[in-house]
């Protein structure tokens, strides 16, 4: 092996190249690689954060849907309860109105009965007076009295 000037020249060129690469090319290259690695790490962190936020948002949506369903069911139950209460109130009002009408009809029937009795009493009194007049006008005769009483019975 001959160590000649070309080997030394190649070694000098290699060290100069190494020094140029180490001084001017390697730092920007390392910086670019570090920036790229940082961007990738930031992107992965952002993806993880986005994934966590998505899961949280999904939980919130599920919770909101559950609350909305529960609220809707509660509103339906309240509406049904109000409808039932209204129906019961209407039934009670109708029953009260029916009872009032029945009581009024009974009172009117009672009044008509009383009026009819009074009218019959008046008619009976008139007929009794007429009968007494006829009896007094005629002679006292048992057969005539019986006929008049039968005639009065027929008129009553």
Curated annotation (Swiss-Prot):
Pfam families: ATP-synt_B (PF00430). It comes from the Bacteria. It is a single-pass membrane protein. The lineage of its organism: Bacteria, Pseudomonadati, Pseudomonadota, Betaproteobacteria, Burkholderiales. The chain crosses the membrane at residues 7-27. Keywords: ATP synthesis, Cell inner membrane, Cell membrane, CF(0), Hydrogen ion transport, Ion transport, Membrane, Transmembrane, Transmembrane helix, Transport. One of its GO terms (cellular component) is plasma membrane. This is ATP synthase subunit b. GO terms for molecular function: proton-transporting ATP synthase activity, rotational mechanism; proton-transporting ATPase activity, rotational mechanism. Its main location: membrane. PANTHER family: ATP SYNTHASE SUBUNIT B, ATP SYNTHASE SUBUNIT B', CHLOROPLASTIC. F(1)F(0) ATP synthase produces ATP from ADP in the presence of a proton or sodium gradient. F-type ATPases consist of two structural domains, F(1) containing the extramembraneous catalytic core and F(0) containing the membrane proton channel, linked together by a central stalk and a peripheral stalk. During catalysis, ATP synthesis in the catalytic domain of F(1) is coupled via a rotary mechanism of the central stalk subunits to proton translocation. Belongs to the ATPase B chain family. It is found in: Cell inner membrane. F-type ATPases have 2 components, F(1) - the catalytic core - and F(0) - the membrane proton channel. F(1) has five subunits: alpha(3), beta(3), gamma(1), delta(1), epsilon(1). F(0) has three main subunits: a(1), b(2) and c(10-14). The alpha and beta chains form an alternating ring which encloses part of the gamma chain. F(1) is attached to F(0) by a central stalk formed by the gamma and epsilon chains, while a peripheral stalk is formed by the delta and b chains.
């Amino acid at each position: 092996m001959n160590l000649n000037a070309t080997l030394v020249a190649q070694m000098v060129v290699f060290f100069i190249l190494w020094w140029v690469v180490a001084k001017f090319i390697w730092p920007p290259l390392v910086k670019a690689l570090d920036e790229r690695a940082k961007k990738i790490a930031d992107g992965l962190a952002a993806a993880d954060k986005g994934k966590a936020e998505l899961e949280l948002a999904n939980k919130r949506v599920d919770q909101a849907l559950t609350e909305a369903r529960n609220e809707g069911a509660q509103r339906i139950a309240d509406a049904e309860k109000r409808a039932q209460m209204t129906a019961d109130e209407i039934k009670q009002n109708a029953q009260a109105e029916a009872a009032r009408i029945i009581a009024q009809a009974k009172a009117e029937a009672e009044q008509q009965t009383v009026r009819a009795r009074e009218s019959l009493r008046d008619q009976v009194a008139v007929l009794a007076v007429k009968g007494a007049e006829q009896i007094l006008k005629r002679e006292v005769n048992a057969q005539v009295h019986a006929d008049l009483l039968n005639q009065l019975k027929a008129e009553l």
